[in-house]
Amino acid sequence: MALGHFTMAFPLISELGIGSPESIHALAEPMFFIALGLLILGNGFFKPNISSFVGTFYKQNSELRDRGFNLFYMGINIGAFLAPITCGAIGQDPNLGVNAWHYGFGLAGIGMVLGLLVFMYGLRTGVFKNNGHSPNPKLLNAKIAALRNEKGEYVGGGMTLKTATYVGTFLLIPVIFFLLSFGSKPLLYPWGKELSFLDIILFSMVGYMIYYLSRYGKTITKAGYDKLKVIMLLFFYSALFWTFFELAGSAITVYTETNVNKTVPYLGELSSSQFMGVNPLYIILLVPVFNYIWKYLKRKKIEPSAPMKFAIGTILLGLGFFAFPIGGLFADAGMVPMVFLLIAYLLHTLGELCLSPVGLSLVTKLAPKQIVGFVMGFWFLSSSLAHLLGKFIAQETDAGDLSPVEALETFNGVFTNVGLMVNHNIDN
């Protein structure tokens, strides 16, 4: 991921006097897609494995597991809070000109390197002890490509499954480059909505992984298969939640830019990207509160089950969307007071804390040990599916050249319908 961020900052070489503006411009687009490929692959290694890694520090039925994942989630959001107020502020700084965002990407790369150094320090000093090792190291180190003798035995050097995984990963970069370059073009128009080749791949992948987990479940105990069924069911529930929650990065950000009074006394006007730091700031402040609440309810033997926490979280998410049309009642020339945006983010964050860390903990608890990383990857696929579904909603909020008053009417209608839709699905 660090390489990806530094590649995103590629146009900054012009600041060093390297290359002509024409050559840099010609390479900008291919370098951008290569950078995205590196980020995608890095994220694929990082997100499911770091979450699975945290789960290895707790015994199977430890009551500390959920609280540990809450703290882990708080750590994630410390970074999520710093990103928009640093990289976002730099990217929208008019004094940095056309390369402003590239400075932000470079700063993100430096942050990735610092995180890697901290992790390497933990490995070298034994902080992690023996947690996180492969459940089947013999298979991982088995040779899959080498010379054989007359007995069919591998001899000499060769490539292990572990090495092949790393080599194959880098070979995927041109594949991702092609998919990002050409796979996003619309192919189908079902129900008047655009579906690209990438969208079709995502739907196919969801179907394949459900098929694979169902087949795998038949090779283990009935109890283990039942646990996989729970994960698969909650996968779709999670996708529903994130479909609406992730509008924060699209429709809600456009709403913030177009229809929110962003002026703060003594600070001036904030950028819309800086409001992306509100959600992680709430998480940092509220995680200790949630840990106390769940601990208290458990002690009283009335702690909600994981599915019930999911339902509570989704109800809070739906209520958050009603803050937008209510704020519209107090609008002045189409500009809504900032407090209503902050209330919406607060309710969304409360809902997120009822679902996301609970879901991560649940997956590490229920998934078979041999495939916990794979199942965690499947779990994160719900977020990908949500982004795909969310884009159809975001398209309905395209303000275009509308005035703030006209745009506010559009947003109020969409957000009201989203709030009703979320709570209707809860009833079902």
Describe these PLM feature segments.
Residues M1-L27, I312-A333:
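C-terminal ends and interior cores of transmembrane alpha-helices
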Residues Q60, G88-T253, E257-T263, K295-K300, ...:
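Intracellular loop-helix junctions on the cytosolic face of multi-pass helical membrane proteins
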Residues D66-G91, G104-G115, M276-I283, F378-A394:
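Glycine-rich segments within core transmembrane alpha-helices of 12-TM secondary carriers
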